[in-house]
């Protein structure tokens, strides 16, 4: 798995881990932040969220074009600096007035621009490492490992966001309750119903920070303190970027030969031989067809920060008991994820000593995870953002499983091509949303709840199961798609084509808002049903053009 990979892969992967940790910490609380601070509706919040995600993934198109001319490393460094300023602006506490909104949108613009310069170009540099014939056969597994490293950062992000939010909110004598922000805004806006006012009063009575406050004062104070706690959560991203820069520059000698522009790559024999116009056209056409398909995958997948977060808040139990508790402790998840790698090491090691050491480590990690679980309270309170740690956990834990399966198939000459894996990923994604559809059948519509939490709450295991299946889909589609772009893109347009991959992701992220717009208008199962249909139609399309896509890698 890690054997015979160039050192540059690990340096670039770790640098990306730090940046992604900050990004996903911010993303875990962003939707909740704008609803709590500004009182935005679900439709407006998901629209802002989707536009931001679209910008984050669209800007790499321009970043890639620029990097093809001036070099990938220069763009990566500039991107980190711009992102840092953006996160710093987002971390500054402001009021919910116009100036606060302007600063927030300016911060989002800076983060999107910085990400555009950083994200795609770092991955092009990873791909450049594998233009060396010595490492060419390792390209697909390298991008799976790189993708796994991204998700290590993402796995810890929701827990960090939760810890920071709870710490600063707790210092003011408050605790997080999902009902309060919406009820507080209704109270301040004069639209609260009598029964909801009674509910808000009951919640306020249970908090020491509300002592001596009338309901209006409590509402404003709670919103202010919660918003400020979120601001501090955004500040974590600044720290993670500093770590990312330190890794990038301290290990730069490991990948310096991959830091070139398009002309330098050709001059140094870094890229493959010049393609004919017909070959170039064939490859670009194949890539554009793949880009068209992945739009709908990302539209569905990135509901994790939009409608799936709303579903976690309004329809899912806020406490867990029994064995499910282990999934809501980041340390136990980390130990379990690491144990997967040591277990594989025990089977794959070529020496008896290596097998023994890996076996002992696996047992120790399992005992550690059980010790963490045994020390947890009988009932654990959870936040909506906690669910976002499951997807990266599953990515980290399942990556070696995925590599082992496809490695075994490759030895038999039966490994599916990258385009075929993408098509299978779309089908698996449809299965994931089918689980959520079934769970939603007997639940009240969001419109009927009027901004409150449903009286009928489902087990968190429904959402966890959905995240598990969607992760299988993601592992089939995302790292394989990036590897496909890296392999098929004409040498002159590597940065631009990687940027187009992210531009397709951007369009999918913009379309994330469509289910959000439907959220308060249709039944829950209709929201998930739309995503199922889109995933299945996309799978049908990609399988219908499979021969064209597979032939592009041969020309």
Each language-model region and where it sits:
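Intracellular loop-helix junctions on the cytosolic face of multi-pass helical membrane proteins
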Residues: 1-7, 132-140, 162-379, 402, ...
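Helix-loop boundary and gating motifs at the non-cytosolic
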Residues: 3-53, 301-311, 369-380
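Hydrophobic core of transmembrane alpha-helices in multi-pass small-molecule transporters
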Residues: 17, 99-121, 445-476
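Loop-to-transmembrane helix entry/capping segments in MFS-fold secondary transporters
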Residues: 42-43, 133-146, 230, 381-382, ...
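C-terminal ends and interior cores of transmembrane alpha-helices
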Residues: 79-99, 366-377, 424-455
């Amino acid at each position: 798995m890690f054997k015979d990979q160039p050192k540059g892969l690990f340096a670039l992967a770790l640098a990306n881990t730090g940046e992604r940790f900050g990004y996903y910490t911010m993303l875990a609380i962003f939707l909740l932040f704008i609803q709590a601070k500004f009182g935005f509706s679900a439709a407006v919040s998901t629209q802002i969220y989707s536009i931001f995600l679209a910008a984050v993934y669209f800007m790499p198109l321009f970043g890639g074009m620029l990097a093809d001319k001036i070099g990938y490393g220069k763009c990566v460094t500039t991107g980190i600096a711009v992102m840092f300023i953006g996160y710093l602006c987002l971390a500054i506490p402001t009021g919910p007035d116009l100036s606060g909104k302007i600063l927030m949108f300016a911060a989002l613009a800076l983060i999107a621009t910085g990400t555009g310069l950083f994200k795609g170009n770092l991955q092009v540099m990873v791909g450049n490492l594998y233009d060396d014939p010595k490492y060419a056969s390792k390209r697909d597994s390298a991008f799976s490992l790189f993708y796994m490293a991204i998700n290590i950062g993402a796995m810890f992000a929701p827990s960090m966001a939760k810890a920071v939010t709870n710490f600063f909110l707790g210092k003011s004598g408050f605790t997080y309750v999902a009902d309060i922000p919406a009820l507080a805004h209704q109270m301040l806006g004069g639209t609260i119903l009598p029964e909801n006012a009674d509910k808000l009063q009951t919640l306020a009575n249970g908090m020491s920070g509300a002592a001596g406050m009338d309901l209006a004062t409590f509402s404003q104070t709670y919103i202010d303190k919660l918003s400020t706690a979120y601001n501090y959560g955004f500040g974590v991203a600044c720290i993670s970027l500093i770590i990312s820069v330190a890794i990038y520059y301290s290990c730069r000698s490991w990948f310096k030969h991959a830091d070139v522009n398009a002309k330098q790559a050709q001059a140094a024999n870094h890229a493959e031989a010049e393609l004919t116009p017909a070959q170039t056209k064939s490859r670009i056409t194949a890539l554009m067809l793949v880009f068209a398909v992945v739009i709908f995958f990302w539209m569905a997948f990135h509901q994790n920060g939009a409608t799936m977060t709303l579903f976690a808040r309004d329809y899912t139990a806020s406490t867990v008991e029994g064995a499910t508790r282990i999934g809501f402790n980041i340390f136990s998840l980390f130990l379990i994820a690491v144990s997967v790698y040591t277990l594989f090491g025990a089977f794959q090691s070529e020496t008896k000593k290596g097998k023994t050491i890996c076996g002992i480590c696996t047992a120790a990690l399992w005992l550690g995870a059980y010790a963490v679980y045994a020390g947890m309270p009988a009932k654990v309170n959870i936040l909506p953002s906690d669910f976002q740690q499951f997807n990266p956990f599953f990515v980290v834990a399942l990556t070696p499983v995925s590599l082992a399966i496809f490695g075994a198939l490759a030895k038999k000459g039966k490994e599916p091509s990258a385009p075929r894996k993408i098509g299978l990923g779309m089908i698996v994604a449809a299965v994931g949303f089918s689980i959520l559809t079934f769970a939603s059948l007997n639940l009240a519509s969001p419109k009927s709840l009027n901004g409150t939490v449903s009286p009928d709450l489902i087990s968190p295991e429904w959402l966890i199961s959905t995240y598990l299946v969607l992760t299988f889909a993601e592992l089939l589609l995302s790292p394989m798609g990036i590897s496909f772009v890296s392999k098929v893109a004409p040498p002159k347009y590597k940065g631009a084509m990687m940027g187009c991959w992210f531009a397709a992701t951007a369009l999918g992220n913009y379309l994330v808002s469509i289910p959000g717009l439907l959220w308060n208008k249709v039944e829950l199962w209709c929201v998930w049903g739309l995503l199922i249909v889109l995933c299945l139609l996309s799978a049908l399309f990609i399988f219908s053009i499979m021969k064209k896509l597979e032939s592009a890698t041969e020309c």
